[in-house]
Amino acid sequence: MDPNTVSSFQVDCFLWHVRKQVADQELGDAPFLDRLRRDQKSLRGRGSTLGLNIETATRVGKQIVERILKEESDEALKMTMASAPASRY
C-alpha cells in the first residue's frame, strides 16, 4: 500500500473531524454541511478499502497536521492563504 495514500487518508480524517466540530458549533452553512455528510460516507468507504480504522487514522492525521503547522512559518502561511483560490460559495 502506498504510504502517501495512507497519510492522505489520515489527514483527511483529521480535517473532517475539525470540520465536524465547526458544524457542531453551528458555524457551517448548508453547502458546508452537505459536503461534511458526503465526505463522511467517502471516508468510511476509503477506510474500509484501505483496511484502516477511522479513529486511529484521525489521531495520526492530527499528529501529521501538528508537525506541519509547527514547521510552518507565519509568513509562509500568509503567502499560502493569499494564493488560495476563492471559494465558489
UniProtKB/Swiss-Prot annotation:
- The UniProt entry annotates the motif Nuclear localization signal 1 at 34-38
Keyword Nucleus assigned to the entry: answer is no
Q: Which UniProt keywords apply?
A: Eukaryotic host gene expression shutoff by virus, Host cytoplasm, Host gene expression shutoff by virus, Host mRNA suppression by virus, Host nucleus, Host-virus interaction, Inhibition of host innate immune response by virus, Inhibition of host pre-mRNA processing by virus, Interferon antiviral system evasion, RNA-binding, Viral immunoevasion
What subcellular compartments does it reside in? Host nucleus; Host cytoplasm
Q: Single GO molecular-function term?
A: RNA binding
Establish whether keyword RNA-binding is in the entry.
Answer: yes
In Gene Ontology terms, what is a biological process of this protein? symbiont-mediated suppression of host mRNA processing
What is stated about domains?
The dsRNA-binding region is required for suppression of RNA silencing.
Q: Which family does it belong to?
A: Belongs to the influenza A viruses NS1 family.
Assembly description: Homodimer. Interacts with host TRIM25 (via coiled coil); this interaction specifically inhibits TRIM25 multimerization and TRIM25-mediated RIGI CARD ubiquitination. Interacts with human EIF2AK2/PKR, CPSF4, IVNS1ABP and PABPN1.
Question: What is the protein's name according to its record?
Answer: Non-structural protein 1
The lineage is: Viruses, Riboviria, Orthornavirae, Negarnaviricota, Polyploviricotina
